[in-house]
Amino acid sequence: MTKFVFVTGGVVSSLGKGIAAASLAAILESRGLKVTLLKLDPYINVDPGTMSPFQHGEVFVTEDGAETDLDLGHYERFVSAKMRKSNNFTTGQIYESVIRKERRGEYLGKTVQVIPHITNEIQAFVERGAAASHDGKADVALVEIGGTVGDIESLPFLEAARQMSLRLGRNHCAFVHLTLVPFIASAGELKTKPTQHSVQKLREIGISPTALLCRADRPIPDDERAKISLFANIPQEAVISVWDADSIYKIPQMLNEQGLDRLICEELRLDPKPADLSMWQKLVKAQENPEHEITIGMVGKYVDLTESYKSLIEALRHAGMHTATRVNIEYIDSEELESGHLEVLQPLDAILVPGGFGKRGTEGKIRAIQYARENKVPYLGICLGMQLAVIEFARHVASMGDANSTEFNLDTEHPVVALITEWVDRDGKVEQRSADSDLGGTMRLGAQRVPIKTGTKASQIYGAEVNERHRHRYEVNNHYVPELEKAGMVISARTPTENLPEMMELPESMHPWFVGVQFHPEFTSTPRDGHPLFKAYVEAALAAQRQGA
């Protein structure tokens, strides 16, 4: 029977519940347990797919095509289990499900209420999500509850967790509460009162935490931990100090050294083998002892909020670990490039344009791509970054001066990028797609396996095929591919059924390393293995750096 660990947060948001949950899961997995993780989001949106990155940060796409919270990206990077749609759900999904049941008459005319109907539905979603992993045989499911204790939005989730612990009985549920211990500079001391109040608030709901993870900018002294223990009525050994670290991959060892996994295993009556964190220690050592150093320019419109590119940043770090390279990222606002200022690109060892939506800042990205192509700077374009590379090439190499995407200009003379319902096929007919087409209507989501053209950079990187995740509405227009290929572009991967361009590159006679991909490779990169595309990209930047030295 699967046992549950609920991870809650108090005082303020953004303390790192996702990292804490993923780190604990990584330790438990190293002890031989089968683990999975779930994220419960208290907002009313059905999913984060239509939310602004400024509001929510990155949207992480699972293998089965779910648009989910960015914490699921942390989960996949820390444990071996692959997340699914059932690993993340929101208040919106819960209410939607309950209302559908009410309309179908499943509640037999009863008054539908938060308790028991909403809380029962939350419990059903949690147990269903846990059962979807490891063929229903997960030993432990860690359940992160979004928001902070005291928020009205989180109350039904906390109540559902309390009811689950009562229903399943002792030793089947544990609670880990993450809280803030701020340092007040004017007083020169850490303050424990917010933590005391947060635990008190949790107890009012009926939940007594098994362990407290106390976040601070420095290690918390034993006397302060003893004070928290006394007022929170928790053993001192269960008051865990979690201070700011320069790498999230140090957190598993930090928690393990203070015995968090032992406390949880004792609470759940589990007796697994000792933890083996040697892999994490090797990764941290590689990160702290690089032999090389490069600077990559990330050109985007969300650069003021790096949470929007969380998986991409981590993928570059993973590549650095596996190539003994410190990867510095220079964030460049694409709108600033529209009025010039290309001199900011000169010191860079490589340029990257990530995914995105909307017209704002696109011309600045195109200028950066043109600079990379003309100055032989290694370039990687992801999703929109590939589409803009095609537009730039069409304009400046294939003599289509007005080339654009119909996302930005519906009246463009050369729509080299368009919605899948807008394509013109080779016979001049309008290509039609519907919701029954592979991966849905106008939004392609989830993983798709694609063969790769032999003799290309793509084949050197991936081999015979690639299986990556998608999240986009627009595609390179097949009608223009022959002209683009005639001008020198190489389409190195296409979908097997619709023949959609998945990867493009320039031959070495035109550029040493210029690659665009329609998918999102950052979603499958892990610190354990890195990712072949990002490793090749970092190696290309190193080669360019050596050549220019």
Swiss-Prot record:
The record's GO CC annotations read:
cytosol
EC number assigned by the record: 6.3.4.2
Question: Record-annotated residues binding ATP?
Answer: 14-19, 71
Query: Which chemical reaction does it catalyze?
Result: UTP + L-glutamine + ATP + H2O = CTP + L-glutamate + ADP + phosphate + 2 H(+); L-glutamine + H2O = L-glutamate + NH4(+); UTP + NH4(+) + ATP = CTP + ADP + phosphate + 2 H(+)
Question: Active-site residues?
Answer: 383, 520, 522
Describe regulators of its activity: Allosterically activated by GTP, when glutamine is the substrate; GTP has no effect on the reaction when ammonia is the substrate. The allosteric effector GTP functions by stabilizing the protein conformation that binds the tetrahedral intermediate(s) formed during glutamine hydrolysis. Inhibited by the product CTP, via allosteric rather than competitive inhibition.
All residue ranges annotated as the Glutamine amidotransferase type-1 domain in the record: 295-547
Name the positions where UTP binds.
Answer: 13, 191-196, 227
The lineage's top-level taxon is Bacteria
Is Ligase included in the keywords of this UniProt record? yes
Which is one Pfam family of this protein? Answer: CTP_synth_N
Q: Does the keyword Nucleotide-binding apply?
A: yes
Which InterPro entries does the UniProt record give?
Answer: Class_I_gatase-like, CTP_synthase, CTP_synthase_N, GATASE, GATase1_CTP_Synthase, P-loop_NTPase
Which principal EC class is assigned to this enzyme?
ligase
Pathway given in the UniProt record: Pyrimidine metabolism; CTP biosynthesis via de novo pathway; CTP from UDP: step 2/2
List the keywords (alphabetical): ATP-binding, Glutamine amidotransferase, Ligase, Magnesium, Metal-binding, Nucleotide-binding, Pyrimidine biosynthesis
Give the binding site residues for CTP.
Answer: 13, 151-153, 191-196, 227
Q: Where does Mg(2+) bind?
A: 71, 144
- Region called Amidoligase domain, residue ranges: 1-270
- GO aspect biological process, one term: 'de novo' CTP biosynthetic process
UniProt cross-references to CDD domains, sorted A to Z: CTPS_N, GATase1_CTP_Synthase
Miscellaneous comment as given in the Swiss-Prot or TrEMBL entry? CTPSs have evolved a hybrid strategy for distinguishing between UTP and CTP. The overlapping regions of the product feedback inhibitory and substrate sites recognize a common feature in both compounds, the triphosphate moiety. To differentiate isosteric substrate and product pyrimidine rings, an additional pocket far from the expected kinase/ligase catalytic site, specifically recognizes the cytosine and ribose portions of the product inhibitor.
Please describe what this protein does.
Catalyzes the ATP-dependent amination of UTP to CTP with either L-glutamine or ammonia as the source of nitrogen. Regulates intracellular CTP levels through interactions with the four ribonucleotide triphosphates.
Q: In which family does this protein belong, per the annotation?
A: Belongs to the CTP synthase family.
Q: How does it assemble?
A: Homotetramer.
Q: What is this protein called?
A: CTP synthase
Q: Which source organism does the UniProt entry give? A: Cupriavidus metallidurans (strain ATCC 43123 / DSM 2839 / NBRC 102507 / CH34)
